[in-house]
């Protein structure tokens, strides 16, 4: 025993028992070495007595010092490897495409990885590794590597938790030996393998340093055995095969890490392979120009389509010196009524959409009255607008690149741009140009059709044989010129702004003389309910509610924010500030179509109900005068604002308790959507889009979003409004429930944009 020293075990899995280690004078293990040539470690009984068989004190101290130095080196190496593991994990996690298929295979003989996981280090495993498969090495150091440190075990626990989610692919293995000099260099791509377990005898275990498995992190299923069973694999061919496998695994890992991976890679567009170039053409576009819902649609729908991955442009007239659009430098000349008219294109890129404005002396200085002038003047403006708009994809280099006519779809809106599908066919398709360009015509209000005498055909500058699509027979006025009729016949697809309105258009009452054409083209007609711009119309973000006593609010702060906005509105308009009085609002065009006359008939009844009424709008002169008269007669209860103000419309929507929309017909309607977003309850005539968007309140099931009436009569309006006021005063919980349902709806344009996309795809593949 003179060549033995007494050591204390540092293994965390076993008690601190002294170990008696045999120190041979010289040990060289080669292929075919016997078991006697291995180091032998025997457990000895721990006694507090000095052993005569132990080495001298000096030899023990020297051996212990050498062991400590070795331990420090191995610990340092382990810490370095753990740091490299963390760095490698970041790289692996960024390789998204390889994570799903990150499965290795593990074979105990060949060293491959299969169905294994990080072993459970909480079990009481013995970390000694016996093996009869001797790897040829020489000059083995006299001291045994220490057991795995606590830091290493803790790090493995962390790695196991991380890999459960990451499912990282197997990495290259590195051999760690306890030779006199650590000859292997650990690269940044190598990681650690947990040493497997060996069957233990009651008194002794064998440790073959050279047969330790390389330390590698492996994902997968739970390991079946912490140690591979002992094998008698000593052939040189097996060792060579194993080395080749290790080199191959390392090369594959190197290739994976060297491949550049873009961490910020964008996901594919929502439109998938159906991404198109879309140009929406409208006579108005919010916030630059707006008289109704058409301007809102032109300002919001393109942004939703752009979010789906399409390249989108909006083309509108430049009625004023807008600050955002800049002169593109492109100028063109078009003939209108035999005269040359020069146009200039102004361009801006906002929220992923190209906005192009056509500037001409025919559009300038019209101001708010964008449809002003006589019938012929309006027709000439629209002829110029459509001629210039259809050539925008060729002439205006948005972002440095023109749209071109490939994979292109035009979206025309109402009669103002109904000439566009006609020009597309007459000027281009009939001449073999833009054969794959499609057009979709959207009906916002079929009551306005661009009607006139047949002589107006001379202004549109078309070949004589195109006269027939414009002809329409009216039982009252006889045969006449109709632009909307020609657009409906030549467009590839037709869209209405609600499902209810698409049904009404097919009737003689709702089709306004065009119902026969619509029924003949029913196969290409589809109704799509409008959405709203949830950035502009959002009580939490509304910039118009950030001053003058108003405040932004959400569903959580509705009970405090909305009363404050109501008080601020009453104060701003000079009405008595009373929280208990229902405040009723109306926002819209002063026109019989909007049911303003029904409100006028119901005003005497309203004034007897202790309510306040605020009306905002412009339109017919007699109805504007009626508004002023109501304010004079009921100065403490009614306010009439003749004109239109975006700020005031937002504040009325936020401050009012109830919104009236008694329209005789309403293709879609947006004000009821704005009102519901702000927790203002709508009372509407159940027509068109109002029927689609406002579900009647059901007090028995606590469902519904407002009140509706079926006939355009003052008595019907009074009945619905009376039930609404009763609920407001007597059933607060039901009222708050209606507000909650209104405010939690998804009213964004995203759903509508997806439906529009389906229509555009159908037009694209139409032959």
From Swiss-Prot:
GO biological process: starch biosynthetic process
Cellular component terms per the entry's GO annotation: amyloplast; chloroplast
Biased composition (Low complexity): 172-188
Keywords attached to this entry: Amyloplast, Chloroplast, Glycosyltransferase, Plastid, Starch biosynthesis, Transferase, Transit peptide
A Pfam family hit: Glyco_transf_5
Spans annotated as Disordered: 160-204, 226-268
Biased composition, class Basic and acidic residues, residue ranges: 230-245
The organism's place on the tree of life at top rank: Eukaryota
Localization of this protein: Plastid, Chloroplast; Plastid, Amyloplast
GO molecular function, one term: alpha-1,4-glucan glucosyltransferase (ADP-glucose donor) activity
Family matches, as InterPro entries: GS/SS, Starch_synth_cat_dom
Pathway(s) per entry: Glycan biosynthesis; starch biosynthesis
Catalytic activity annotation: [(1->4)-alpha-D-glucosyl](n) + ADP-alpha-D-glucose = [(1->4)-alpha-D-glucosyl](n+1) + ADP + H(+)
EC number(s) on file: 2.4.1.21
Induction statement: Constant expression in light and darkness.
Keyword ATP-binding set for record: no
First and last residues of the transit peptide: 1-45
Family as reported in the entry's similarity comment: Belongs to the glycosyltransferase 1 family. Bacterial/plant glycogen synthase subfamily.
Function: Accounts for only 10 to 15% of the total soluble starch synthase activity in tubers.
Note: May be the main starch synthase responsible for the incorporation of phosphorylated precursors into growing alpha-1,4-glucans.
Protein name (Swiss-Prot/TrEMBL): Granule-bound starch synthase 2, chloroplastic/amyloplastic
